[in-house]
Amino acid sequence: MGRLRFVVLLSIFPIKTFSEPCSTMALVLRDSIKISEFINLSASEKLLPSALTAVKSVRISKVDKIISYENDTLSDIDLLKGVKLVENGYVCLAGLVVTGEWNLPDNCKGGVSICLVDKRMKRANEATLGSYHTSACKKRFTFKIIPNYSVTTADALKGIWQVMINIRGVEMEKGFCPLSLEFVSICVVYLNNIKLGLREKILNVTEGGPTELTEAVVDEFVEKVPMAARLKSFRSVNKKKPSDSSKFVNGKSRLNSRNKLNYENGDSDVGISVVDDIVVGNGVSDIRIDDDCESFDAQSDPY
């Protein structure tokens, strides 16, 4: 009788499967991005309300995507996409996870150098925050960079980060995309300068891991030129070029789309929001495409 009743209940309430919309377009495995890999918060910061601590929230940004069409590009990247900032406050860029995928057949020659840039800094060696090198035969790759420094909310809203992509040895016709990159950042938002006793602790990177923060050349295809020298040369060349006209997608300008950052005043919840967005890197300019079908809200990150 009990088994029969169980079968009847199953027939009345059919089992449904829920899937994330458009999830197949994302290269980044969101479940693998853990805040604990980048920062350690004190017990008071975990348990007390945000009004009683300097740290207001720890957040994972939305996904920003770059499609590379040229061998040398310097494109703006929104590392705080979807992060709610505190007015007149600060945000610490604790960590960055980058995932790339080569859109090439197997066993292709060549490779790429990727460099994160703070465009506020005039000296090229001070503007480079980290670099990574890999070959085209490695179809998919992931690496982490730990900038671990803070900027004001006012500076963050101006979009101060860029990514320099240097592809070498890949023989492909112009107008096609050899490489796709996705970026997700881990940020700490706070109102006042965190005291030394409360400051977040960045975990060390194990030797032999995927992170690379040096200028060392690890692949034969990479020319023996430091990324800082490449950035200085790239900037000097582009200063001589006339600025491109603004480009629009679906009636929205690229600049307006980039500045869509929200504020919060004392939000005590730790929120995680992830969404895909596409930026097409074309020389120095790029086009941003908003795709609402890939957006969703994730659950709060437990500590």
UniProtKB/Swiss-Prot annotation:
One GO MF term attached to the UniProt entry: RNA binding
GO biological process, any: transport of virus in host, cell to cell
Domain of life: Viruses
Locations listed in the record: Host cytoplasm, Host cytoskeleton; Host cell junction, Host plasmodesma
GO terms for cellular component: host cell cytoplasm; host cell plasmodesma; host cytoskeleton
Transmembrane keyword on record: no
Matching InterPro entries: TMV_movement (IPR001022), Viral_movement (IPR028919)
Membrane spanning stretches: none
Keywords: Host cell junction, Host cytoplasm, Host cytoskeleton, RNA-binding, Transport, Viral movement protein
Function of the protein: Transports viral genome to neighboring plant cells directly through plasmosdesmata, without any budding. The movement protein allows efficient cell to cell propagation, by bypassing the host cell wall barrier. Forms a ribonucleoprotein complex with viral RNA. Binds microtubules and modulates microtubule stability. Can bind double-stranded DNA.
Family the entry assigns: Belongs to the tobamovirus movement protein family.
This protein's name: Movement protein
